[in-house]
Amino acid sequence: MLLLLHRKHDAQTDAYGLYLATCSSDKKVKVFDISDNKKPLLIKTLEGHEGPVWQVAWAHPTFGTILATCSYDKTVIVWKKGPTPDDWTNIFTYKEHTSSVNSINWAPHEFGLILAAGSSDMTASVHTCITETRWESVKIEAHNVGCNAVSWAPALQNRRFVTGGCDNLVKIWKLDEEAHKWINEHTLEGHTDWVRDVAWAPCLGQGRNIIASCGQDCRVIIWTQERDQWRRKELSRFRDVVWLVSWAITGNVLAVSGGDNNVSLWTERENGEWDTFSEVNNVPMPQPLPPTSLVRSSHQLAAAKQLDAD
């Protein structure tokens, strides 16, 4: 199940469910051992940011145990675990953004160790690991006022990712392999206020591209690509700002959370309409900027509840 974690800005488990990383406004990132399904054991506190830490993101285990973090302090940091649980090293720091870095997302591992980030300085950045000590970074002029969210497309196609911004737009970016530059392939209009989150759906067995976006305008929009065009379908209007959208790994269930402290699950019916089939009400949730994140597994939620109880 896709559920919500309160109090922390973000919490993510690694691919094997061995570690849980959390971050918050105390500038710290905490890594817990959750491998025994008992009380989470704090094994490392990562300190390096100088402001609230908004998001954490685990890289694919192909590359080792690697965690990326982003912060209000305008930086992105990539950490790697050594041979012992408490041995963590900062292997990359990016300081070229001029405002808060709000969102990070790793590319599919088939493309290599590549991280995208979105910032309030109106840009997105893409960071490619050549070696652990050498990274190549590029900035893209993405959204007027600021970029709130980034999400990569599945690896079944060329390198693409989607961004959402304070200009009310959703933009799709494609790598021009010959020119070695990112180009704005599509700009999707439909929101009437800031886009708070975007999520490109996994395409297991679907054979089509689907993106979910949500915003300050209380809307959730499902974008489906048909040939070179994107078709828009809006879910039923929500009562409050919608902070987050998150797909199940199968790509056919969407979790939505917002300012009304509710989390709802949606799926597409055979007639193409989207319906909600489950809802959790009155989930305590602060509203930082960026907003809190969805926990992506019940294992993660159980660990988080134990942390909050301490």
Where do the language-model regions lie?
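WD40/WD-repeat beta-propeller blade N-cap
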Residues: 2-8, 46-53, 94-101, 140-147, ...
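Terminal intrinsically disordered, low-complexity extensions flanking WD-repeat/beta-propeller proteins
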Residues: 157, 180, 187, 206-211, ...
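WD40-repeat beta-propellers
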Residues: 29-33, 56, 76-81, 104, ...
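Conserved strand-to-loop turn within each blade of WD40 beta-propeller repeats
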Residues: 23-26, 69-73, 117-121, 163-167, ...
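Loop/turn segments within WD40 beta-propeller blades
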Residues: 11-17, 57-64, 105-112, 151-158, ...
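Beta-strand initiation motifs
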Residues: 1, 37-42, 84-90, 131-136, ...
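Beta-strand-rich domains and repeat architectures in extracellular enzymes and scaffolds
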Residues: 3-27
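WD40/WD-repeat beta-propeller blade-loop signature
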Residues: 7, 16, 42, 52, ...
